[in-house]
């Protein structure tokens, strides 16, 4: 879908709910950056979270957030060190840690929730026992995004009898 449609949708939702939003693009780093850059000025003053910022697009997403007073969802593969590295890069860009949330990727399938949870635990241990400021951030767990990638989530009653209408 066009970026203009994402902007119009974000504006309509923001006006309807009146609270800060967490806005993510379609999952492609370049497209996510384009959406963040287009949506950020429209939502000035609402302190929304823009994302997903990755190693490939953190400069563009971070600059959009910094320029218009938003926060960033920093997304990294399921790895504590990569999550910390991205947090460091975003703070060096000028974002305050208070405006960051981490998405260390949640594997509803594949790696599984257990492995994802163990990464969350190690992140919290680093934050608490090592007093690591870059890891003392809120965690965003996007479990649903991974679950919807499964073929069963898109199958209808005809494709998978007994599963119900999905």
What are these regions (language model features)?
Residues 56-166:
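Catalytic alpha/beta core domains of metabolic enzymes, predominantly
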Residues 1-84:
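Active-site beta->alpha loop and helix N-cap motifs at the rims of alpha/beta catalytic domains
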């Amino acid at each position: 879908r066009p970026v203009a449609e994402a902007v119009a949708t974000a504006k309509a939702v923001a006006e309807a709910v009146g609270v800060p939003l967490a806005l993510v693009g379609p999952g492609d780093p370049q497209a996510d950056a384009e959406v963040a850059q287009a949506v950020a000025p429209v939502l000035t003053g609402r302190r929304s979270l823009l994302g997903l910022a990755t190693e490939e697009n953190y400069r563009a997403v971070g600059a959009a957030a910094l320029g218009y007073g938003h926060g960033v969802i920093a997304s990294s593969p399921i790895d504590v060190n990569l999550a910390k590295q991205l947090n460091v890069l975003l703070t060096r860009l000028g974002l305050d840690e208070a405006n960051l949330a981490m998405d260390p990727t949640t594997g509803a399938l594949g790696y599984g929730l257990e492995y994802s949870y163990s990464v969350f635990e190690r992140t919290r241990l680093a934050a608490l026992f090592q007093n690591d400021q870059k890891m003392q951030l809120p965690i965003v767990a996007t479990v649903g995004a991974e679950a919807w990638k499964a073929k069963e989530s898109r199958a209808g009653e005809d494709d998978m009898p007994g599963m119900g209408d999905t």
